[in-house]
UniProtKB/Swiss-Prot annotation:
GO biological process per UniProt: translation
Protein name per UniProt: Small ribosomal subunit protein uS12
Protein family (similarity comment): Belongs to the universal ribosomal protein uS12 family.
Record function comment: With S4 and S5 plays an important role in translational accuracy.
GO cellular component: a single term: small ribosomal subunit
Stretches for region Disordered: 107-138
InterPro entries: NA-bd_OB-fold, Ribosomal_uS12, Ribosomal_uS12_bac
Keywords attached to this entry: Methylation, Ribonucleoprotein, Ribosomal protein, RNA-binding, rRNA-binding, tRNA-binding
Length: 138
């Protein structure tokens, strides 16, 4: 334990908290260009082919970014919007692509949580149709 005189001379070291998405430079999102689009396998208990892209951001930093949803239209040189948010079973992937923004298409056929995947409200053919409840006959 330090003496009071040592604390007067030196003081206590304050630890700086490390950010979770340092490549975004304190911005909510950043634009970037896909350098490589590929699939990779997750960590041990899980099994899948996760869609990932290597993106060069406008601040010239390169990051690994997860592509959420089923199917995508991304390829090399696609312009994407990147937000923070890691993928727990993919080491080194700390960012997500925003679906439905810039060159990234929304998930087609998505009915629930559409705003998270950039899916528009599905259009019905003949105006507004109401579901008629059926009565149970005993």
């Amino acid at each position: 334990m330090p003496t009071i005189q040592q604390l007067v001379r030196k003081g206590r070291a304050t630890f700086l908290k490390k950010g979770k998405a340092p490549a975004l430079d304190s911005c909510p999102q950043k634009r970037g260009v896909c350098v490589r689009v590929y699939t990779t396998t997750p960590k041990k208990p899980n099994s899948a082919m996760r869609k990932v892209a290597r993106v060069r951001l406008t601040n010239s930093k390169e990051v690994n970014v997860y592509i959420p949803g089923e199917g995508h239209n991304l390829q090399e040189h696609s312009i994407v919007l990147v937000r923070g948010g890691r993928v727990k079973d993919l080491p080194g992937v700390r960012y997500h692509i925003v679906r439905g923004a810039l060159d990234t298409a929304g998930v087609s056929g998505r009915m629930q949580r559409r705003s998270k995947y950039g899916a528009k409200f599905p259009k019905t053919g003949t105006g507004k149709t109401k579901a008629v409840p059926t009565k149970n006959k005993k």
